[in-house]
A protein has these predicted regions:
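A solvent-exposed interaction/effector surface
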Residues: 1-212
Length: 212
């Protein structure tokens, strides 16, 4: 059986529909940075997706190729994720100003993937898929203390979920802790091409710290 991060790490990928506090461990990602409305056809976000999946599946399928990755185990490619921010002192997201989005779009990689393995995957994917993978990077993220919640419904309805998260954060004696390294985080458990908007499931996660 292939290792499924969603099933084995339910605290990270299957939170309740009510907010909760969690300490997220360090993780590795294949990532692409960009700007702009994620819904724009041919935009930076849309162009990032085949690059991310190209690397993730190259690593997964390495078992059938010439590269032997130390510590390799078969795995289900984890869900697409995104770190989002706008130029705002508060760190709040304005869902109307989609053109002002900055993003890091990413897919989690197993811990066995080293820099050499990643560089091999980039070269292998470039040769086989005939795409320009120069924008991808191996990203290490240590999110640490966060509040998170399962959001069900359209992405544009997330402010209600974020409001509940903010209220819970305050009640528990914490405050938001957005910075140039800590962002609004979304994990996409549903494929919007195949799922009705009202049934979309998205993990929403925000960095927090103890109130002083």
């Amino acid at each position: 059986m292939a290792f499924d991060f969603k099933k084995e790490c339910k605290e990270l990928y299957r939170p309740a529909s009510k907010p909760s506090i969690i300490t997220v461990p360090p993780m590795s990602y294949v990532a692409v940075r960009g700007k702009g409305d994620p819904n724009t056809e041919g935009g930076e976000y849309q162009n990032a997706l085949p690059l991310l999946y190209g690397i993730a599946y190259t690593v997964k399928m390495s078992k059938k190729g010439s590269r032997s990755i130390e510590g390799y185990f078969d795995f289900v490619v984890p869900p697409l994720e995104g770190f989002w921010w706008q130029e705002s002192p508060s760190g709040d997201i304005d869902y109307v100003r989609k053109d002002d989005f900055n993003f890091i779009s990413c897919i989690r990689l197993p811990d066995f993937v080293t820099r050499d393995d990643f560089d091999w995957a980039v070269a292998e994917a470039t040769a086989k898929k005939k795409l320009d993978f120069s924008a991808v990077e191996l990203l290490k993220v240590d999110e640490g203390l966060c509040v998170q919640c399962m959001h069900t419904g359209p992405y544009d309805n997330e402010p209600a979920t974020v409001g509940a998260m903010n209220e819970y954060t305050t009640e528990q004696g914490y405050v938001p802790d957005f910075s140039d390294t800590r962002f609004h985080h979304e994990i996409y458990l549903s494929d919007p091409r195949k799922c009705a908007p009202e049934k979309l499931k998205t993990v929403v996660r925000h960095p927090i710290k103890r109130a002083e």
